A protein has these predicted regions:
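Solvent-exposed loop and capping/linker segments of extracellular ligand-binding repeat ectodomains
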Residues: 1-14, 19-37, 47, 51-443
């Protein structure tokens, strides 16, 4: 004998109920129904969803069952087998900015599912550092313009960006949307060679470190890095000589320190070191030395080639050693992070940096070397927070004909001779009461 089971999908606009005939005493076997943007939560005996129906129940008479639905969230999460973390994939996400949380229900989100956000209309994507695995094609077929990820690739061996857009190898750069302009890589590990191979449409790139890579190595060739205008390296122990060579469009640069490492002096402590000594299209030659004597004797200087359009440099940490920015004629701005451990600005550090507009001496600086801003073009200088500076050395601002405004440190004791020699644009200056000595020709 047969009995009829009527399956009512139980929502406005639903298709007509379907009837399933089964043998009396059998259990219901039917695939779970689906509904866009909703998750099926089981069958109930009433349309009011008061009594759940157990699908293992033997059915001996005609019966009508009613579906229960729950609206899907924008993001869906799946608990890992060990119960310690979650993976994430799309629910009803409608496009636009996608922000993946670092935690869900008190546990870390560690994985983005393969194809988990494929073709969902995402334009800006943020993946937190808690994520250690991004599945293949996780963000495929989206016109993403800005992307923040903890690693380049899946974090599990496929160490190239195109993987998370569905590519099998780094050679398939076309998988990466050409709308992508800004890429931020989190974590603290340097990326692998060819991780961005062939992706020549980026113009804003932030990396956690470079290690022994050059930017050209990262992109699989120098031809792919000529469009990057904003570049940041946030950490790491070192940057190789010439690591940034070929970045001809560069306008803004953030570095973890000046030169090869945080503590290097000599050639390795010069800003131009990371751009190298070989010319490239869009570069200009600078001569940087380690003293004022080197400045007036270019044959004693080191030669570097720096992007012609580079205007702004942000230094995250470390001292500025002798001659560091000597003859950097295009720079208009050099700034330091608020938490930078900068205590020293060396001799001739900005000598000949003729385009400088304003400069704020970091609060932790206690010593500024002779000739530090001599022949520079700096117009305004703020030393008011650097209250450990007690001496303005000779020629610190000498021959600077553009300097118009300066705030001196409140604990200043000595202004040495020639400190402001030929600073003809400086009309007014407030000298702290703490000053006891002013050298000859100081002004």
């Amino acid at each position: 004998m047969q009995v009829d089971v009527t399956l009512n999908l139980n929502y406005d606009g639903a298709p007509a109920p379907t009837v399933v005939s089964i043998a009396e005493g059998e259990t219901l076997y039917a695939e779970n129904p689906t509904r866009d943007e909703y998750e099926f939560k089981g069958w109930y005996l009433e349309a009011t969803l008061e009594t759940p129906f157990d699908v293992t129940t033997q059915i001996n008479e005609d019966i009508t069952l009613y579906a229960k639905w729950e609206v899907l969230p924008e993001l869906r999460f799946e608990l890992s087998a060990d119960g310690n973390s979650y993976s994430v994939f799309a629910g009803t996400f409608k496009g636009g900015e996608l922000v993946i949380p670092a935690t869900y229900e008190g546990k870390p989100v560690t994985e983005v599912k393969a194809e988990g956000f494929k073709n969902v209309g995402a334009t800006k994507v943020y993946v937190p550092d808690s994520v250690t695995k991004i599945g293949k094609g996780a963000f495929a077929e989206n016109n993403i313009t800005e992307l923040t990820v903890p690693v380049l690739g899946d974090g599990q061996g496929n160490a190239f960006l195109a993987y998370i857009f569905g590519a099998d190898s780094a050679d398939n750069a076309s998988a990466v949307p050409e709308t992508l302009r800004k890429l931020v890589v989190g974590g603290n590990a340097a990326p692998a060679a060819n991780a961005l191979k062939g992706i020549d449409w980026l113009n804003d790139l932030t990396l956690p470190a470079l290690g022994d890579l050059s930017v050209a190595n990262l992109f699989g060739g120098g031809d792919y890095i000529t469009g990057i205008e904003i570049f940041a390296v946030l950490g790491g122990d070192s940057i190789e000589k010439g690591a940034l060579a070929g970045m001809s469009a560069l306008k803004e640069l953030t570095v973890p320190f000046v030169g090869a490492t945080k503590n290097d002096t000599g050639e390795e402590g010069l800003f131009g070191y990371i751009f190298g000594s070989d010319s490239y299209s869009g570069s200009f030659e600078i001569k940087s030395g380690l003293s004022a004597e080197d400045y007036i004797s270019p044959e004693l200087c080191f030669t570097f080639y720096v992007p012609q359009g580079l205007k702004k440099v942000t230094v995250l940490d470390g001292d500025v050693f002798d001659g560091a920015f000597m003859n950097m004629r295009t720079l208009t701005e050099v700034v330091f992070a608020d938490d930078a451990d900068t205590t020293y600005i060396g001799e001739a550090a900005f000598m000949g940096a003729t385009a400088l507009e304003g400069f704020t001496v970091p609060a932790g600086v206690s010593i500024v070397g002779d000739y530090a801003f001599c022949f520079s073009g700096v117009r305004t200088v703020d030393m008011s927070e650097a209250d450990e500076i007690t001496v303005l050395p000779e020629y610190i601002f000498g021959e600077n004909t553009r300097l118009a405004t300066i705030s001196l440190p409140e604990n200043l004791v000595t202004i040495e001779g020639y400190a402001f020699y030929m600073a003809s644009a400086l009309k007014n200056i407030v000298i702290p009461d703490s000053v006891t000595t002013i050298g000859e020709y100081a002004f």
